A protein has these predicted regions:
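Conserved donor-binding loop and adjoining core beta-sheet/short helix segment
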Residues: 37-116, 240-269
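A residue-level signal for conserved active-site and pocket-lining positions in enzyme catalytic cores
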Residues: 22, 167, 309
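Short, conserved active-site entrance elements at the starts or edges of catalytic domains
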Residues: 184-244
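Conserved active-site alpha-helix within GNAT-family acetyltransferase domains
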Residues: 112-133, 162, 300-317
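Acyltransferase donor/substrate-recognition loop-hinge adjacent to the catalytic core
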Residues: 125-208
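Aromatic (often tryptophan-rich) hydrophobic motifs at membrane interfaces
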Residues: 233-326
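Short catalytic-loop micro-motif centered on adjacent basic/acidic residues
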Residues: 103-104, 175-177, 292-296
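Amide-forming acyltransferase catalytic core, primarily the GNAT-like/NAT-type
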Residues: 2-57
C-alpha cells in the first residue's frame, strides 16, 4: 500500500526514510517515555501499516489495523498547535473508520494533558476536549536509576545478587560481546525460536494460540531491527556460553540521560542469565554512553511482567494515557 488520502488529508507511508522527519519533531520534546522514538515505532509496525502526516505543524503517526485507523502517539509539536492537530486527527480517523468507537490516540504523555489543563490560553479548547473526549490512564513505564541496577545494594536486591553470583559460578567462561547485526543474527534468531518453544510448552492451548499471534509481530520486529540496526542507532549486547548464544538485549538512547530496552531474550535453562545481562547492559550504557536512567517500557498489562519490573525497585513510574471520543 502506498500513500492514503482520508478526508482530503494525505497520509504518507511510515518507512525508514521517515526517520529524520519524525526525529526533527521529537528533538523538540522533553519526554522520557519509551514509545517516543522512531526506532521503537518503526520496528514494531508490520509492513505497510504505518502512516504519517504533518497536521497543524505537528507530526501525526497513524496505524491501520483491520481497516481501522488509530494513532500510536499524540500529535508531536508545539503545545499551541497540538490541540487543534488532535481534533483534526480524530476527524481523519472518523472519516476512515467503520465507527468512531475505533478512533483513539495511544501513549499520550501526562505532560501533554497537564499542559491543556494549566494553560489559560487553551481553556476553551480544554473545555471542548472534556466535553467530547475521554482520557483514560492505561499503562506505566518503569524507569530505574542506572547505578542502582549496577550496584544492586541492600536487602531488596538480595535475590538478584544471588542469581548473578550463581550464574557466574556456573558459567565462568561466559563471553559478552557488543551486538553485531551480521555476526549475531543467526544465533539470535535460533535463541528466539528456542525461547518461544520453551514458553509454549507450559501454556494451555488457548493461551498458547494468543501468545503465538503476538510472537509473529515480535519476530518481524527483530528482523526489522537487523535490517536497519546501524541506521536506527541501536545499542545491544549478546552473551555466549560454551560457544552458544544464550542471551541478547537491544535498546537505544531516548534522551541525553535516559536509555531504553526494546527487546531482551535469554535462555530459560540458563539460570541467572537474564539478571546478569541486564546488569552488564546497564554498565555499558553508563560507561560508554553516560546514561543515568533506564526505561524498560511498560508491562503490557501482564501481572508476571509487572512483578519482575517492580522487583528491580523502579525510581519512578511514568503514566501513559489513551484518548477516546465520547
Amino acid at each position: 500500500m502506498g500513500s492514503l488520502t482520508v478526508n482530503k488529508q494525505k497520509l504518507k507511508r511510515f518507512t525508514i526514510t521517515t526517520k529524520p522527519i519524525m526525529e526533527k519533531y521529537l528533538s523538540k520534546l522533553d519526554v522520557d517515555l519509551s514509545d517516543y522514538t522512531f526506532a521503537a515505532n518503526y520496528i514494531w509496525l508490520a509492513n505497510s501499516s504505518g502512516f504519517y502526516a504533518i497536521i497543524n505543524k505537528c507530526f501525526c503517526l497513524f496505524i491501520m489495523t483491520g481497516g481501522e485507523l488509530t494513532m500510536l502517539l499524540p500529535p508531536l509539536g508545539k503545545k499551541k498547535n497540538a490541540t487543534d492537530a488532535m481534533i483534526k486527527c480524530f476527524e481523519v480517523m472518523n472519516a476512515n473508520n467503520s465507527s468512531p468507537y475505533y478512533s483513539r490516540i495511544d501513549y499520550v504523555q501526562a505532560a501533554m494533558i497537564e499542559d491543556f489543563v494549566q494553560s489559560a490560553d487553551e481553556a476553551e479548547s480544554m473545555f471542548q476536549m472534556l466535553e467530547n473526549y475521554l482520557v483514560e490512564k492505561k499503562l506505566v513505564d518503569y524507569v530505574y536509576e542506572i547505578n542502582a541496577l549496577i550496584e544492586l545494594r541492600g536487602n531488596s536486591y538480595h535475590t538478584k545478587r544471588t542469581e548473578i553470583n550463581k550464574f557466574m559460578k556456573s558459567y565462568p567462561d561466559y563471553v559478552i560481546e557488543q551486538l553485531d547485526s551480521v555476526k549475531h543474527k543467526e544465533g539470535i534468531m535460533h535463541l528466539f525460536d528456542k525461547w518461544v518453544s520453551d514458553r509454549v510448552k507450559y501454556m494451555p492451548k488457548e493461551e498458547a494460540e494468543v501468545f503465538l499471534e503476538g510472537i509473529h509481530q515480535e519476530r518481524h520486529a527483530i528482523k526489522q531491527m537487523f535490517k536497519h540496526y546501524d541506521e536506527l542507532s541501536l545499542i545491544g549486547l549478546v552473551i555466549y556460553i560454551n560457544g552458544e548464544l544464550k542471551g541478547f538485549t537491544v535498546g537505544e538512547r531516548i534522551s541525553q540521560d535516559t536509555a531504553t530496552v526494546i527487546i531482551e531474550k535469554t535462555d530459560f535453562e540458563v539460570l541467572g542469565c537474564a539478571q546478569f545481562i541486564f546488569r552488564e547492559f546497564s554498565k555499558m550504557l553508563k560507561e560508554h554512553y553516560g546514561v543515568e536512567y533506564i526505561n524498560v517500557g511498560d508491562d503490557m498489562g501482564f501481572e508476571n511482567l509487572r512483578k519482575v519490573k517492580m522487583s528491580y525497585r523502579p525510581f519512578k513510574l511514568v503514566p501513559k494515557y489513551t484518548i477516546y471520543q465520547k
